[in-house]
Amino acid sequence: MAQFYSAKRRVTTRQIITVTVNDLDPFGQGVARHQGKALFVSGVLPQEQAEVVLVEDKKQYARAQVKRRLTDSPQRQAPRCPHFGVCGGCQQQHASVALQQQSKRAALARLMKREVDEVIAGVPWGYRRRARLSLNYQPKTQQLQMGFRQANAKAIVDVVQCPVLAPQLEALLPAVRECLSALSALRHLGHVELVQADNGPLMVLRHTAALPAGDREKLERFSQTHGLSLYLAPQSEILEHIHGEAPWYTSDGLRLVFSPRDFIQVNDGVNQQMVRTALEWLDLQPEDRVLDLFCGMGNFTLPLATRAAHVVGVEGVPALVEKGRENAALNGLSNVTFFHENLEEDVTRQAWAKHGFDKVLLDPARAGAPGVMPHIIKLAPRRVVYVSCNPATLARDSETLLQAGYQIQRLAMLDMFPHTGHLESMVLFERRLT
């Protein structure tokens, strides 16, 4: 007769060990050594000793949680945010900005197998001009939760302040919470998005059921009182403009109008420096033809057009192409054209590419641009500037250019998101003369 039984559950004793952290990875985790492999410990800095509990032990690495910190690094600082350590937004407020930049710079250098020439950074606090806050009504407490997701969890951390937000947006948080809590439809609210445009703040409210007329009136009064533009989003694809003027921001002195749904760089200060650096690295001449791939609505494209003979911007999102054309017209630029194309296809076959390009700029998403790199090589531009939000895909794509005879002339780390593990960068490639 068959015997059915439950196997005894294997119990693993959580081992407590004492370690000294000797490095910080780009995500803000301390790195120590244990039994010949890397041990990652959140919350511990280089030169600090701590008692830790092993929570994961793999063949190549292990992870641990801090039980007790025994020493403090001179680079340790008190986090400004009361939610740090619970909120998933920031991972490195306990480390000095200098240490954060040093660890990211070192990580980029390792991946690119080259020293980093410069760090492009702005103010470390109050830099975020965009934030999406989750909303959730709690029937038991009859309170509306408004905040960011908890680290490694779906739970919402109710935020009362956020020091990385632009000061104008952080100041709005209590008033936004009070306004939304007074709505009769507060059980049907999904999230609220706040954006600081150059011409003032805007708010987008995602709601999952129709708002009563009284709620709409309350929201409109709120937007008028606080001088912000208001948009309602009854569905993810629908955006209803209720109050205020269309938002815009500047890039190298040019005005770019955008929709709340459009991608814009979160850190305005670093974006301005990044655009100026790209213009400088490309060494634009009045006769140059320039190609801007993954151009969005013209963050780089339009400034390029003020210095070159002709610029072509290519983008895979039709709405951004239309916005780029609109912004070119608003700025009186007639030497720039925008095209909607599938960037995985051979762009060199397009009619607009038949005259070739002297310089190329690309700013792809995290997946990088593996399908585009061979086409850039076909175009044979003298200089290429690659702006990246993922150093791993940048390193991969760079190999294609290096093997084709290009050389890295400049490498910069962009500290676009201080106190987080995000690492952005930009590289200048120059074709080697034969």
Curated annotation (Swiss-Prot):
Record: residues binding [4Fe-4S] cluster: C81, C87, C90, C162
Stretches assigned to the TRAM domain: 10-68
EC number, UniProt record: 2.1.1.190
GO terms assigned for molecular function: 4 iron, 4 sulfur cluster binding; iron ion binding; RNA binding; rRNA (uridine-C5-)-methyltransferase activity
UniProt catalytic activity: uridine(1939) in 23S rRNA + S-adenosyl-L-methionine = 5-methyluridine(1939) in 23S rRNA + S-adenosyl-L-homocysteine + H(+)
GO biological process: rRNA base methylation
Key words of the record: 4Fe-4S, Iron, Iron-sulfur, Metal-binding, Methyltransferase, rRNA processing, S-adenosyl-L-methionine, Transferase
Keyword rRNA processing: yes
Residues of the active site: C389 (nucleophile)
Sites where the protein binds S-adenosyl-L-methionine: Q265, F294, N299, E315, N342, D363
PROSITE patterns tied to this protein: SAM_MT_RNA_M5U, TRAM, TRMA_1, TRMA_2
Superkingdom of this protein's organism: Bacteria
Described purpose of this protein according to its UniProt entry: Catalyzes the formation of 5-methyl-uridine at position 1939 (m5U1939) in 23S rRNA.
UniProt record similarity statement: Belongs to the class I-like SAM-binding methyltransferase superfamily. RNA M5U methyltransferase family. RlmD subfamily.
The protein's name in its UniProt record: 23S rRNA (uracil(1939)-C(5))-methyltransferase RlmD
